[in-house]
């Protein structure tokens, strides 16, 4: 079993991204995973998932979602 990491932000905190593609953007923490040390910030770090067509879904689609980022890449604003 993994040891849970101590994270310096809480759900609802406004944070500023300090590294990466979304550097200097500000968002609100919406979810925290203490086992991996990652957080999801609303409106930051969007990724795309391509879904192939299959029997139940006859047309493919592209879904957009917010990917988690490590808590060390943000600071409280």
UniProtKB/Swiss-Prot annotation:
Keywords per UniProt: Chloroplast, Plastid, Ribonucleoprotein, Ribosomal protein, RNA-binding, rRNA-binding
Pfam families for the chain: KOW (PF00467), ribosomal_L24 (PF17136)
Gene Ontology BP, a term: translation
UniProt name for this protein: Large ribosomal subunit protein uL24c
Subunit composition and interactions: Part of the 50S ribosomal subunit.
SMART domains cross-referenced by the UniProt entry: KOW
UniProt GO molecular function: rRNA binding; structural constituent of ribosome
Superkingdom of the organism of origin: Eukaryota
InterPro entries reported for this sequence: KOW, Rib_uL2_dom2, Ribosomal_uL24, Ribosomal_uL24_CS, Ribosomal_uL24_KOW, Translation_prot_SH3-like_sf
Function: One of two assembly initiator proteins, it binds directly to the 5'-end of the 23S rRNA, where it nucleates assembly of the 50S subunit.
Listed transmembrane segments: none
Cell compartment(s), UniProt: Plastid, Chloroplast
Organism in which the protein naturally occurs: Trieres chinensis (Marine centric diatom)
GO cellular component, one term: chloroplast
